[in-house]
Amino acid sequence: MVLEYADLECPYCARAHLILKELPVRRVFRHFPVTSKHPRARVLAAAAEAAALQGRFWEMHDSLLEDQAHLDQPHLWERAERLGLDIDRFERDRRSPEVEERVAHDFRTGIRAGVVTTPTQFFEGEPHPGVPGPDLIARFTS
């Protein structure tokens, strides 16, 4: 199992995602929006959590990381529609205190775990910051 802390607007997180999604390992995702560098990171995290409430977290997660050129509001709605989400519910949920708290909770747990950059993967309790390299990939799959 790999626990990953990532920012959905971070280009390094997008690179890590492309590697991790191909590996035969269970992934647990935690939001770590670095808003000082990525101003839409918290909005995108809320969108992913709103999609999760309709059972489509990973689809929204993948869509955001795999097309970072289109992370503005109109494209969020387009993604939500393409995923078959109830748009009214999606909008309500992504602005809800519960979703905001979920994202904030993930961020706080990352801080407590020592996350200082994105992406950071935890494997066997050890933090591994940055895009996974060949040695770490080999450990993930052994």
PLM-predicted stretches and their roles:
Residues 3-82, 86, 91:
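Structural alpha/beta surface segment adjacent to cysteine/selenocysteine redox centers
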